[in-house]
């Protein structure tokens, strides 16, 4: 009988009696011959409802522009915070677009093929969600020409560029809102916003604002998207940057725009400019109503995957100070293998395969604490979560700095500067795991397919902390196993459910043994392994 062993420390006595799997969950393989969504390097979609084919093959990297890198070629204001000082809510560090361009080799070495940028337009905030001008690059980030240079450099390396679109609200400094502040009822733009009376009070907190704002924050006046002029303006912004050459839009709080047909029109108009444009919505909860029929978004930021994966890999190591006051960010309580299986099954059942392939999967972001801090500094949790992220269907997204073990609590601490000058403090284990897993994803089409067959745990998992899944695509077949528990686990799956003739351990440590009637999997505590099987 063939036996494949990893680290010799994983040798165990197979005379033990592991539980046998009686339940296997299978998600039907997507057929590239009948559905073009899965074809690599395919041409642009011919139907408005098609998802861009490049997304399922992409590995994203999220950049918060003020904190990633800064170039000496961009003139800066004097009053900047020190790069390595703790971030504050309102302070600027001075990161810029040419700084990103000068570090593209780093991203290429990681295997990154797409960048999602937090907002880059003129704004009065370091995060730039307070938009002043949707048609100009923020001067601290550089010039419009700097953006063109960055875009060209990314495309030369095969890296796609996705921008953050904030279309639900603008800012107090947005020209048309400022005109309303100056001219009141006589402003030609009074209908662009939800005005409840005059005078407007954008700063006097002891007076009613007299206008609607996002979450009541006066700095963020909400657009009246029922107004034809305002709506056409926002559509034009989407078209303009699509015409400038971007590859996608990440849409901020899109579910808060209630105007009927708004996002359908946005998709139609922007995809008319670039038929291969990726449109992904920031929706924290289950988002099938926004993505399933392909009339609005290609996919969603997949926070249900985030929270399930953290609950499984981090478990009771979770730092309570990193918890968010968000009912959809349910990283606690901890779950075992069965709990993780249930949440992943629920997630995959809620989306058709094209949407699953276009979802943006992540572990952390500018809106959450960083995963290393969530896990109270436990690097095992990060490595296990990366293994699940980079073998899951859809596009994985790595938040800048996660690959070197950058930590940080809730906003603003999760927006620390990238520690370029402190390489000695980088977490080399996390960095190597990130590089190796990204490379493995690029090498194996199976890891980018929708064929996701859960082999373990069964329905009666009885507290098992192991999770095993088969990933397959034509002749490419892999077994991915994670043991999130504190003890070694040995589990058996019947040969009828999972059989192989040869297996090669390509990442991690573990032992895989094929018997006459069963396949035995053995993993040490807090470990993961990936095999290529035939």
Identify the function of each model-found stretch.
Residues 64-67, 121, 138-141, 167, ...:
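Short, flexible loop/turn elements at secondary-structure junctions
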Residues 1-64, 68-70, 75-114, 148, ...:
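Carbohydrate-interacting/catalytic domains
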